[in-house]
Each structure stands twice: as C-alpha cells, then as structure tokens.
Amino acid sequence: VNLGLARIQRLMFLLGDPQKKYKTIHVTGTNGKGSVTAMLASCLQAAGIRTGMYISPHLSSYTERMVIDGQPVSKQQFAETLSVVRDICEFMQGEGDEHPTQFEVLTAAAFLLFQKAGVEYAVIEVGLGGLLDSTNVIVPEVSVITNVTFEHADKCGGTLEGIATHK
C-alpha cells in the first residue's frame, strides 16, 4: 500500500467532498485521542449542536466508529453508505486507480454519513500518525494535539520532533 492522501482525496472528490459540508475538529496525539474526541463531541452536543464523531478502532462493531449526537449509526445506515462508497471504489479501480484501504473506505463512509445526517460539526480522531492519515482530507476549524511520545517512531520519524511534525 502506498502511503499518502491521493486515494482518499480522489475518493472524497468522487463522493462530492462531503467532509467540506460541515465544520470539523481534528484530534491527534499519542494517548487520550479517543477521550478528548468523545468529550469534545459531548460538549458540542450539550450545546445543542448536531454533532458527528469518528473514532478508531472499534470494540465490537464498525458502527461504533461513527456516532451522531451520541448514538452509533445504525447497521442499515452503515450498510447503505458503504454500498455507495464501494461503488465509487469500483469505479476508481476501473479507471486504473489503486483501491482505497479499509481505513480510507471507513473514513469516507463516516464523512458521507455525517453529511447525510446534517451535522454542524464533526469531531474526528486521527487513525495513525497524522500527516498521511486519511482523516487529513479535512480542513479543521480546530486541531487538538494531546501528548506526543515515541509511538509509531518507525512510521512518523525517529525523533520526538519528527513524530510531532507528523501528528
């Protein structure tokens, strides 16, 4: 798999760039990303703002990764949205593009689900790294960095500064 944003950027473009239809908060760091993401989403929701939340990994079901106003998306919503994304992925392959990764497909599905649900804000947790992570197709209103340690040093640079740059 080639690291980079080209596949997810193309996929999002073909889906109509749903991630540009609402405001986003991007959360990265080594530890605490999921907790910070959940707290921010909860605060927005408590303020009466329709809110999406995207986290990874899940514990028991893929639908846990995509939350709207505190509730995981339904299996039906998830399946219908994945079907749309799958069709675009097949079109991309037919055009000679590399098939998006599983995480790219899930990220695209989350962003499309949030648009369809009419969220005002989506709080997005980075998957791996940051710089080349597929969630980086968003242009966030706010970026949050929790603590940074030597996690993923092989992929994000061998120094703390290199890792911080990636995150």
Predicted regions and their residues:
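A conserved segment at the C-terminal end of the G1
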Residues: 23, 27, 35-52
